[in-house]
Amino acid sequence: MSNTQNPNIHCSFCGKSQDDVKKLIAGSDVYICNECIELSTRILEEELREEQDSEMLEVKTPKEMFDHLNEYVIGQEKAKRALAVAVYNHYKRINFAASKIAEDIELQKSNILLIGPTGSGKTFLAQTLAKSLNVPFAIADATSLTEAGYVGEDVENILLKLLQASDFNIERAERGIIYIDEIDKIAKKSENVSITRDVSGEGVQQALLKIIEGTVASVPPQGGRKHPNQEMIQIDTKNILFIVGGAFDGIEEIVKQRLGEKIIGFGANNKKLNDDDSYMQEIIAEDIQKFGLIPEFIGRLPIVAALERLTEEDLIQILTEPKNALIKQYKQLLLFDNVELEFEDEALMAIARKAIERKTGARGLRSIIEEVMMDIMFEVPSHEEITKVIINEAVVDGKAEPQMIREAKKK
């Protein structure tokens, strides 16, 4: 209320008297003027805006994410596009919720299923995207998970890995990305696919359902099984993006059966090799369910992207072109010893062929190069006269020694 009886009354905050302001509001032995009220209101509004801005994530456009992936990932154009759009929409959804615009509309989370052979780049795609967005990222192996009551990891331990990746910053963790690999290995037993282990089958799918769709989970900070008296960390998973991946070996046969195309007779193997990738692009939810994932679990993974088997040409590009290309890395390692490293084209082709023969894809390239480079990297630092090392096809195949160019004295 305004007080005009006592001329000594003044604002308790700015010290102005009642004659210098329009209004003085009285409290219990405290007074505040209209100017201080207006100032405090502005301060509060600014703080609220700043808090809201801090909740908003800076999201790259799908094109920007796609271009970033192209710097590191060779091939898989369709999968990269699908992943870029899905991740963009996911973080746009989080910003939409933080902005409190159209609160009567609820945008649901769209988790992602990546299907592709071993070494096709599923894990690397997810990892590269998370790094470009500067959000916490964790990788889990579905085969290590078991349902409650069995020996193994609780599904909540996946969230612990994300917390660790965010230095236990819960707010950052709640906007992170989790990649669960080998998801096809927890398919339930079915007449179409032989799965020997059911302990981590349908039961684990059921356990994963809640954290994938969004729940407040209790996470043991030290990991392991939960104990009644153990202090827990509460983490809300509604804004965590889950990307799950698996090879789904044999699912192309399920697709063929659905499409009514059975490959039999002479030349079947050649046709199979040529057509498997195209069949993988035709996968629908029905095929995944027939493989062994339960409908409820599939429903939480509305975006499905199939990765193609990497060709010899793809693997050579992976070896030489990306920013983190293995050949560039090994060249730099020898350059530290002032030695030039050269891989002949035939050597690169031989490395790619080995990876295909071993069915390891891009994942196996490093181990093959390590086999080739081990003795070289052991010997070179002790021989200052060596200035260049040349590796050809015979060296990769273990049939010859690398050519080493020497000078009388190394400068």
UniProtKB/Swiss-Prot annotation:
Keyword Zinc-finger: no
Boundaries of every ClpX-type ZB domain copy: 1-52
Family matches, as InterPro entries: AAA+_ATPase, ATP-dep_Clp_protease_ClpX, ATPase_AAA_core, Clp_ATPase_C, Clp_protease_ATP-bd_su_ClpX, ClpX_bact, P-loop_NTPase, Znf_CppX_C4
Molecular function GO labels: ATP binding; ATP hydrolysis activity; ATP-dependent protein folding chaperone; protein dimerization activity; unfolded protein binding; zinc ion binding
Cellular component GO terms, alphabetical: HslUV protease complex
Protein keywords: ATP-binding, Chaperone, Metal-binding, Nucleotide-binding, Zinc
GO-annotated biological processes: cell division; proteolysis involved in protein catabolic process
Binding residue positions for ATP: P117, T118, G119, S120, G121, K122, T123, F124
Role of this protein: ATP-dependent specificity component of the Clp protease. It directs the protease to specific substrates. Can perform chaperone functions in the absence of ClpP.
The protein's name: ATP-dependent Clp protease ATP-binding subunit ClpX
Organism: Lactococcus lactis subsp. lactis (strain IL1403) (Streptococcus lactis)
